[in-house]
Amino acid sequence: MAAASSRSFSLCVLLLLLLLAPPISASFLFDGGKSKSAAAAAAVDMEWRPATATWYGDAEGDGSTGGACGYGSLVDVVPMKARVGSVSPVLFKDGEGCGACYKVKCLDHGICSRRAVTVIVTDECPGGLCAFGRTHFDLSGAAFSRMAVAGAGGHLRDRGQLSVVYRRTACKYGGKNIAFRVNEGSTNFWLSLLVEFEDGQGDIGSMQIKQANSVEWLDMKHVWGATWCLVRGPLVGPFSVRLTTLSAQKALTARDVIPRNWKPTATYTSRLNFEAAL
């Protein structure tokens, strides 16, 4: 988790240097040359699609600790506990797919349950079965086992790799509101935030903040995973934060959610969330 925070801070500093060098476009660097409007889908795809799935970690384990999205220890506790998934780049979307929720189910009716398991994107699997444009889920042992009929989890895990179908589903965090973690290394000139517990679509396409006594919304840059960064200053709190989803451009504003006396590594919880629907 400390390494993730250090990486976020380093990337924010790099962004500052790029902003001071006009010939280089910082947005091109972090967006891979794609505009946000081009990357965002007009609607959420609700159809079942084919994919493959494997599992990792302990047989009934929760999956990875942390992961490429930067959620850290959140993946080890409810509501993420045992529901985490590592996905191939086509679903990870350079980190913009972090927080999205999917239903996944296997197809062999002799061993597979008819119900689907719900997983949350918390990590990326970049190689092997996840490479070359494939759609792949590398699930925690617990999530993988839940696709089996009662008592057959061990037999399903023995197969190792499965053909599955998947589709997007609404994220539901059981009454939790959206929270913002101020990443380690943040200052009044380098502010880095990680977004947690977004109901509904779960993915974030853009993020803006507004300072105290200001009417101007400042665009934050997507750095990696679920982390966003603003290089400007001095910044004066309290900060309001506006989120827009990647998939369907739904917006939400958390007013004065980060206080004037904010601290690095602290988490600040809003009083609202997106509707728990797609």
Curated annotation (Swiss-Prot):
Membrane topology: Peripheral membrane protein
Intrachain S-S bonds: 69-98, 101-171, 106-112
Sorted UniProt keywords: Cell wall, Cell wall biogenesis/degradation, Disulfide bond, Membrane, Secreted, Signal
InterPro entries in the record: Expan_Lol_pI, Expansin/allergen_DPBB_dom, Expansin_CBD, Expansin_CBD_sf, LolPI, RlpA-like_DPBB, RlpA-like_sf
GO biological process: plant-type cell wall loosening; sexual reproduction; syncytium formation
Localization per record: Secreted, Cell wall; Membrane
PROSITE patterns (UniProt xref): EXPANSIN_CBD, EXPANSIN_EG45
GO CC terms, sorted: extracellular region; membrane
Transmembrane feature ranges: none
Pfam families xrefs: DPBB_1, Expansin_C
Secretion signal, residue range per the UniProt entry: 1-26
Domain Expansin-like EG45: 66-176
Domain annotation Expansin-like CBD: ranges: 189-270
Annotated PANTHER family: EXPANSIN-B17 (PTHR31692:SF82), EXPANSIN-B3 (PTHR31692)
Protein family per UniProt: Belongs to the expansin family. Expansin B subfamily.
Protein name as catalogued: Expansin-B17
Origin species: Oryza sativa subsp. japonica (Rice)
Organismal lineage: Eukaryota, Viridiplantae, Streptophyta, Embryophyta, Tracheophyta
